[in-house]
Amino acid sequence: MTVLGSCSLGLRVLFLISAFFLSPTASSTDSAYLADEGVSLGVSLGYGQLANPVYKKDDIPLYALPRIEVFAGDFSFANTQFAWTPVWGNNYQVSLFTQLNEDGLYFTKHSAILAAVRTASGRPSMTPPPPGSGVETPVVIKRRGDITKISKRKLSAMSGIEAIVDWQNWRFSAYWSMELTNYHKGLQGALSAQRLFLFDQHLVLLGVELQHLSAGLVDYYYGSALQEMGAGFSPYLGRSSQKYSLKASYQYQFNQQWQFISDIKYQRLSSGFADSPLINDSNLLSFYAGFAWNF
């Protein structure tokens, strides 16, 4: 398990590709990206960035993204995600998978040119209390310090089960996973829906996802305990939280080897994340555009 804790930059770059997709194994069955059997290799050159919500941590730039995919019967490996699909049919499949957790990625170091630090904005209350009620909306006061002195967050691995159902041009999926690396013993699940549009060589994919993360997982990455308080941060105990995502992808197929690809993803973090003094922004926008070459 220490291999994941000291994960190389190359493996993290591979994981960046996986972080753009809405579900753990949904990308492994998209005919626009992958083959059904054998080895599929590729690389895309372009520009983009993965938004980083952590205080004083830069957005992660994306330039050259490799693609490594292996399919052998019911087993597959795609962009650091391993899957076994023992149950499948013409329009459904059930898979067991193992993948890296994206939250640990926000705390790792990268050698690429860093983007500007994101700026947080206040979140006003939805409705004021009625006059004379004596009830006040609690105000979360974040005290921040030196982010370099907080305790180390390691990149964890999650394993679970996912079910996918395809209906006409729609794909619906649900997954639930638990941690393997024993860092936070957290749980994570999600529901997602995607709609595919095909126009000759043009492909458009629209998706929406709701993720649920357990209190243990949120507290491990975004909680503030003794060491964080010593570094100047206010205390915070993580609680179960949600991530809400919208995603749009566009591809243009020049031929079997060359494609233009683009992805944009908006993600909203619930108050369980936003109230943490380690979180700088709860509205995240990630994107990438470039040319992909399939070997």
Model regions and ranges:
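Outer-membrane beta-barrel proteins
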Residues: 29-33, 51-53, 72-87, 167-169, ...
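Predominantly the C-terminal beta-signal and adjacent terminal strand-loop region
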Residues: 251-295
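Residues on the lipid-exposed face of transmembrane beta-strands in outer-membrane beta-barrel proteins
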Residues: 45-47, 66-72, 83-86, 159-165, ...
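Cleavable N-terminal export/targeting peptides
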Residues: 1-37
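Short glycine/proline- and aromatic-enriched beta-strand/turn motifs that initiate or cap beta-hairpins
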Residues: 27-78, 82, 104
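Outer-membrane pore/translocation modules
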Residues: 81-190, 198-201, 205-207, 217-238
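Transmembrane beta-strands of outer-membrane beta-barrel pores
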Residues: 47-53, 72-74, 98-104, 167-169, ...
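Outer-envelope beta-barrel architecture signal
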Residues: 35-41, 62-64, 75, 88-94, ...
